[in-house]
Amino acid sequence: MTQANRVIIFDTTLRDGEQSPGAAMTKEEKIRVARQLEKLGVDIIEAGFAAASPGDFEAVNAIAKTITKSTVCSLSRAIERDIRQAGEAVAPAPKKRIHTFIATSPIHMEYKLKMKPKQVIEAAVKAVKIAREYTDDVEFSCEDALRSEIDFLAEICGAVIEAGATTINIPDTVGYSIPYKTEEFFRELIVKTPNGGKVVWSAHCHNDLGLAVANSLAALKGGARQVECTVNGLGERAGNASVEEIVMALKVRHDLFGLETGIDTTQIVPSSKLVSTITGYPVQPNKAIVGANAFSHESGIHQDGVLKHRETYEIMSAESVGWATNRLSLGKLSGRNAFKTKLADLGIELESEEALNAAFARFKELADKKREIFDEDLHALVSDEMGSMNAESYKFISQKISTETGEEPRADIVFSIKGEEKRASATGSGPVDAIFKAIESVAQSGAALQIYSVNAVTQGTESQGETSVRLARGNRVVNGQGADTDVLVATAKAYLSALSKLEFGSAKPKAQGSGTI
């Protein structure tokens, strides 16, 4: 593998992906995802936007102290205060990057920035020079680049390269471009930019027209050697380019691209499942690579062909992307040390002995209900337990559901708020409705339910049900998750989890005037 054919994978799940409505993660959840991304083999982890809030700064800083192989990056606007906060946040990382940006399209410069092109260039150059005080690895992005004038882009990119930028990122911020135009744009821009051959060119594509992956691949054909993407394509609006699709497209169609990545493809599905569990965003069954149906064959002709020779209808194996990782993990006789070791193997570290003891107690309860415990069960269990460890949270204690044909279901539920036990009862059009009404009779949150979903963690009737609840109130949108072999218990846990984030979680407003690439 040479530098010319090596593609750098820049994962922004923890920054751009987290901007999906309700996908905000706690610091501990971000660290879990970062560890899995490092295991996946991504080159750059964009850990967040350090200047956006104190919580963001803490999360970026914690990831910088945790990750040793991947480069840890923070986004920042082309503003000195932002850049210095980013530099301080990533300082502990063995390998660190600052990613600074400013808008370059005529519409953004005129209406958002209210700056002249010359002023934008001056701000960009100053930003890169400040970033170089903290690290030699500086990325510069031209927000809304694909709607910018190419001659102006060449001028500003040449200026920031001279100032010390080592990576130039060209985002399709609003998902406007189409593949052949993207390839042409990159080819022309790289040639026109002074010293354009001395830096790594990067693509960051949004999926508003469903073309994020196609545009990213086209950018590679046009000379880019870094792709910015997210697990499961998570991101604002219609999302970002998905890391799994880009990586497997390059691997399966190596004959066309001749490009390599450093990704361990067997970690793709585990990464997808972890991000889905933590964010509460389920993966659609027909999603390429990581969807539950990605390797299913219903047609008799297809089934016959696959049985005779797999490659008749499969261009890659399920095992190559990690579907074989649905392994039996532990059983009811497994001890605490075996449990702790298994969590470490899965990249899960709990912050205290108290947290480990609580998770182990939950594991033993689960093992009594479910004969076979799989890796996915442990991920769901730990996510559920970590969500209830906060002392200032809503915590599930117990519930009784009464249903009879022709009668309204009734829910009697016991839970606590800040350690104070509460009891509530309600009837509803169904058991789920009754549970939500019972909780709300005490919580009085005033939140609107946006999404309620249930997914089986593993196969079989003994599987844990993993539920997601999305609540909205004002400009706050939160996701809550719950897991249990009883889906109605999981439902109550998910609703209480969402309420905990809504009432006690720190709000995370964007920094004033911030944009997104």
UniProtKB/Swiss-Prot annotation:
One of its GO terms (biological process) is L-leucine biosynthetic process. Mn(2+) binds at D16, H204, H206, N240. GO terms for molecular function: 2-isopropylmalate synthase activity; acetyl-CoA C-acetyltransferase activity; manganese ion binding. It catalyses: 3-methyl-2-oxobutanoate + acetyl-CoA + H2O = (2S)-2-isopropylmalate + CoA + H(+). It is an enzyme of class 2 (transferase). InterPro entries: 2-IPM_HCS-like (IPR050073), 2-isopropylmalate_synth_dimer (IPR013709), AIPM/Hcit_synth_CS (IPR002034), Aldolase_TIM (IPR013785), LeuA/HCS_post-cat (IPR054691), LeuA_allosteric_dom_sf (IPR036230), LeuA_bact_synth (IPR005671), PYR_CT (IPR000891). This is 2-isopropylmalate synthase.
